Regions:
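Short aromatic-acidic-glycine turn motif
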Residues: 231, 374-381, 454-457
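Subset of Sec-pathway N-terminal targeting signals
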Residues: 8, 42-169, 501-535
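Exposed acidic/Ser/Thr-rich ligand/metal-binding surfaces
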Residues: 42-50, 146-365, 424-435, 514, ...
Length: 535
């Protein structure tokens, strides 16, 4: 009984208080119907037969200070953006953030736990977005290249609160393309001379080469103390030639990544394919040490090139000196995505199984703005997206860069909600008039995006009605909320002191679903590893 279509007609409407972009108001895609209809649902359709908390162990969390003698990789660098605290809806009714489809934090966390290293750089949204969810996909003739799904249920770690799960699902239909113009930009500096770096890099790119054909071209640039062009616009079906270059790579020297980036973008521009997919794929540990090397210096360089229509994908490798903050910044400012490759299986996931998502953009500069109804929500906080938050006025600013979403990608965000007391006052936005003030809506999701290559945005609006609340959330909700709870426990969030890895594990294990690739089962195993290490 999973709702599969937009509930209500698609109609044109003027955005309340907005005049900037074409706006459509769409009835939110509810992952569940009204609560009364849920009693007949069974586990087979993703719904839980048991109540939400039945049989769940409420053991305490394992805070980071209990990691005893577990070492930390002190040379690794991560972004330290502060976690968002609760916001009062009466004074801050809007929450705005840029979309993010990166998944690097999850595979890096997996590497850290398997290595026996205390977790660092845990970004909630990247853990959640690592997994697939059964969101409805847009119809082939849909006006917008995505759907929006909202579901709200009780918070597992704070039963007096609620959790809102918002999912933006992009169409899996990739744009018509004249072929791929791809530049491999490969770090072959001395720091890459480790089995889990350059050899894994070469094997990973061999997998990618197998996905290409005669309509594609590949250039290969390497950099260490200086950069070198090893291939220039080689047809994709000359796989043997490309693989031979990859197998002969050797590491040595310093890391002049900025010059390598410059050369890679120049090659991409020289071979630019109008109507095609033009992309630089950077593979590195991020340890730039010659020339511009800080995230700020590199993003200044990247932003100029991002305007040219050339996208970037960043693949991180290795451990010990990983500069996660640098690689994430390059991807965020370069119209790109960022994945961390810890195993060949992960390379296969990113470069083969998710090839279209990694390579083809269907929505550019996608921003999300959530407007909360003070009649139903007193306070809220966004879980994750700590370095993707935007000022509210930046939502309408078409010059403000945001995240790009690939074919088949999904963007999932969780909000923790404090319910309003009965008779709460209303704000002066969508819920300002008397009739709206009596609304039982929880929130309204505004999504703003550009078609690839367009200069102006379109805004679509998805209200979340009272019917999206359920006491029997879907297996997707239960699993994803378990990922969130585990992340909160690992990071020792002061706003979720009761977050429990034990409870997260039990909920995740009970919500594995089909799990075709075994990724959800693997997550359960990672929680076990975490608890063993933390003692």
């Amino acid at each position: 009984m999973r709702a599969r279509s937009l509930m209500g007609a698609l109609f044109t409407a003027k955005a309340r208080g907005r005049e900037k972009a074409p706006t459509r108001v769409v009835a939110a895609v509810a992952a569940v119907a009204v609560v009364g209809a849920l009693a007949a649902c069974s586990g087979a359709d993703g719904m839980s037969d048991a109540s939400y908390h039945e049989g769940i162990a409420y053991d305490g969390s394992v805070p980071p200070e209990q990691w005893r003698d577990v070492p930390v990789d002190e040379q690794e660098e991560y972004d330290d953006s502060p976690e968002q605290s609760f916001q009062d809806v009466t004074t801050s009714p809007l929450s705005t953030f840029a979309s993010d489809v990166d998944t690097a934090s999850y595979s890096n966390l997996r590497r850290q736990l398997r290595q026996g290293v205390a977790p660092e750089g845990v970004r909630i949204e990247e853990l959640v977005n690592y997994f697939d969810y059964d969101y409805p996909t847009p119809d082939g003739d849909a006006e917008d290249p995505f759907t929006v799904t909202t579901q709200i249920a009780e918070s597992p770690w704070s039963p007096d609160h609620q959790l809102a799960m918002i999912g933006v699902q992009a169409t899996a239909a990739k744009p018509t393309s004249q072929g791929n113009n791809i530049v491999f930009l490969l770090d072959v500096s001395g720091s890459m001379d480790e089995p889990n770096k350059l050899p894994l890099l070469a094997d990973s790119f061999e997998l990618l080469v197998e996905q290409l054909d005669e309509d594609d071209t590949v250039s290969i640039v390497t950099y260490a103390g200086s950069d070198q062009v090893l291939a220039d616009s080689v047809p994709g079906d000359r796989r043997g030639e490309l693989v031979e270059i990859l197998r002969e790579l050797q590491a040595g020297g310093s890391t002049g990544g900025a010059q390598g980036l410059q050369t890679a973008y120049e090659l991409a521009a020289e071979n630019f394919v109008d109507g095609g997919n033009n992309r630089v794929i950077l593979a590195t540990d991020g340890d730039f040490n010659v020339g511009p090397s800080t995230p700020e210096q590199l993003t200044d360089l990247i932003e100029d090139h991002a305007k040219s229509g050339v996208y970037i994908s960043v693949l991180g490798f290795g451990m010990g000196n990983l500069k996660d903050n640098t690689m994430e910044a390059i991807a965020d400012h370069g119209n790109g995505n960022y994945a961390y490759i810890d195993t060949l299986d992960e390379a296969r996931k990113v470069l083969v199984d998710e090839f279209d998502s990694t390579m083809f953009v269907v929505a550019q500069d996608l921003k999300v703005q959530v407007e909360f109804n003070p009649a139903t929500v007193a306070e809220y906080r966004l879980l994750g997206y700590d370095n993707r938050r935007l000022e509210d006025e930046e939502f309408d600013d078409d010059t403000k860069d945001a995240g790009d979403v690939g074919a088949g990608h999904a963007v999932t965000a969780f909000y923790e909600l404090v319910p309003a007391r009965e008779g709460a006052p209303v704000d002066d936005l969508d819920y300002q008039d008397v009739e709206s003030g009596q609304s039982t809506d929880f929130l309204t999701v505004h999504v703003r995006y550009k078609q690839p290559g367009a200069g102006t945005s379109t805004e679509v609006v998805f209200p979340a009605r009272a019917s999206v609340f359920t006491t029997r959330p879907t297996s997707d909700f239960r699993f994803a909320s378990a990922v969130v709870e585990f992340a909160l426990a690992v990071t020792g969030s002061p706003h979720a002191e009761d977050a429990s890895p034990t409870r997260a594990r039990e909920r995740a294990e009970a919500a594995l679903g089909e799990d075709s690739y075994g990724l959800r089962s693997e997550f359960v195993g990672l929680i076990d590893t975490y608890q063993e290490l933390a003692g």
